[in-house]
């Protein structure tokens, strides 16, 4: 089956660490993580890596409570340029060569019956999209207890992101 030619076993790793604590009026949490996913597609080193960091702190003094949250994520990924790799592989007739590659000419054979695509050729030689993305999320909130059962709360937040794509 042609899917065996374009798919492979891939490793996924995910690591996280966090520290939390506090006292009578203040609590905190800090966490960091790393994620690495190799691609299941044959070809160059497709995959995704992500680093993330998060911190929360809350403090209370008399009738006032303040909370600050900050998170950051950096991601690198490399993907195939063909969005129909699996669909094109499933369209290849079974009577075609098992491996759609001619070692004599060094060329990939085309499936001219249903599509002019060769999924393996596109994965190995068709180029790639490379992404570098950064995300920041920040929130600050303040809460004042006016009377029993009535609180006033204000929230200020920002989402900042920078997405970069290269081919």
Kindly give the residue locations of the regions a language model identified.
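Membrane-embedded beta-strand positions in outer-membrane beta-barrel channels/transporters
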Residues: 14-16, 52-54, 137-139, 143
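Surface-exposed loop/interface segments of Gram-negative outer-membrane beta-barrel transport/assembly proteins
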Residues: 1, 39-137, 153-167
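Residue-level signature of outer-membrane beta-barrel architecture
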Residues: 21-23, 57-61, 142-144, 148, ...
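Residues embedded in well-ordered regular secondary structure
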Residues: 1-44, 82-83, 122-126, 143-145
């Amino acid at each position: 089956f042609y899917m065996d030619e374009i798919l492979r076993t891939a490793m996924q790793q995910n690591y996280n660490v966090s520290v939390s604590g506090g006292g009578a009026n203040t609590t905190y949490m800090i966490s960091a993580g790393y994620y690495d996913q190799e691609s299941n597609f044959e070809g160059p080193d497709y995959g995704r890596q992500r680093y993330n960091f998060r911190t929360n702190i809350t403090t209370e003094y008399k009738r006032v409570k303040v909370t600050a949250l900050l998170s950051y994520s950096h991601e690198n990924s490399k993907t195939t340029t063909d969005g129909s790799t699996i669909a094109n592989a499933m369209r290849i007739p079974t009577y075609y060569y098992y491996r759609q590659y001619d070692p004599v000419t060094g060329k990939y054979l085309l499936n001219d019956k249903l599509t002019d695509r060769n999924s393996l050729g596109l994965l190995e030689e068709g180029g790639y999209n490379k992404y570098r993305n950064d995300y920041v999320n920040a929130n600050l909130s303040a809460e004042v207890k006016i009377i029993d059962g009535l609180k006033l709360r204000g929230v200020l937040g920002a989402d900042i992101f920078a997405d970069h794509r290269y081919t």
